[in-house]
């Protein structure tokens, strides 16, 4: 019977090692060790900022800031999705996952989880995919259009999308368009 099998599986999972208890953001150190935590538009496989981009920083802040782990959808037993609050305890974003930390963070030489969370929130508000946007910002930085690691400038470019600015529209159209325009 399916329900009995599901119950047994759920129980075995919950009693076993919880390798994803911190979500996919918890694999940042492993990816860095394996040279797959892309840095500076994929020109390097390791980030010197791995400690400040590690998803463990998110979990460490739960007690002080609020937030927490939750299930990404009804019925999910893993509960590896996170809710991130800012330093004042206000909701900032949710589901700050490995891919977002990698592309909006290390790929752009952005140094901290808080900076990535700010960019993630802007992407959410603008309806932008964080992976595509991080890749486009990386191309912009790599081509000299913005300083590496300048999260404030990256935020300004994302905000420019709503005003129809040239650079903002280019980033909003994605990495292929950004690559074509930036050569």
Residue ranges and their predicted role:
Residues 1-183:
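Intrinsically disordered, low-complexity segments enriched in small residues
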